[in-house]
Amino acid sequence: EICACLVGSEMCIRDSMKRIVTLFLSLVLLLSCLCAPASAMFDPSLFYEVQAKSAYIVNTDTNIIVYDKDSSRQVSAGGLTKYMTIALLLTNYADQLDNTFQMPFAISDYVHNSDNADMRSNETFTYREAVYAMLLRNANEAAMGLAYSLSGGDLAGWVSQMNTLSQRIGTTGSTWTDACGLDSGNVTTAVDMYLILRYLMSFCLLYTSDAA
């Protein structure tokens, strides 16, 4: 397990492998969330057992690290990989989120027995809908279908861009090998996920929930 939290007046995020939790003002994407007061002396272990292998909690109001448990330890990224797919999408297409793509048959079939939002082959979706499917349903077909369409079928090229952007964001312990997290080669750290989440918060998509 890995836990990366940003605690303050803006948001609190906790992620445990494939379970994605985002709490931000009126946009609440809740699967499993823990929020607690943030201070320089905050120690979660005083209130509950920290079961995550690594954890990293930052007060976004002060940028003070309020809790650190082996935050540089490299662990399997799992569903967290989708955050990098979303980051790459927003970096290149933040002003085009209402553009559409068609779900490829090969992708829909590939992720059929994994976490999905029932986005079927040949159906048309907006980029925005794919992002919401990833956040709300941990939808593998949303990530893979979007990556396939935007890369012109060059999934390896998309993954290469994910790794380039990840390094530009400042991550040092992350490697991405697919767009959704099904591949076991996807690895990250708690501190890297903090950097990625902080980068994502610079995009207005995560600040509003009026468009879907």
Language-model segments: residues:
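C-terminal segment of classical bacterial N-terminal signal peptides
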Residues: L31-A38
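Single conserved hydrophobic/aromatic residue that forms the stacking wall/gate
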Residues: E1-D15, Y207-A212
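Generic structural signal for beta-strand residues in well-ordered domains
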Residues: A4-C5, T22, Y48, A94
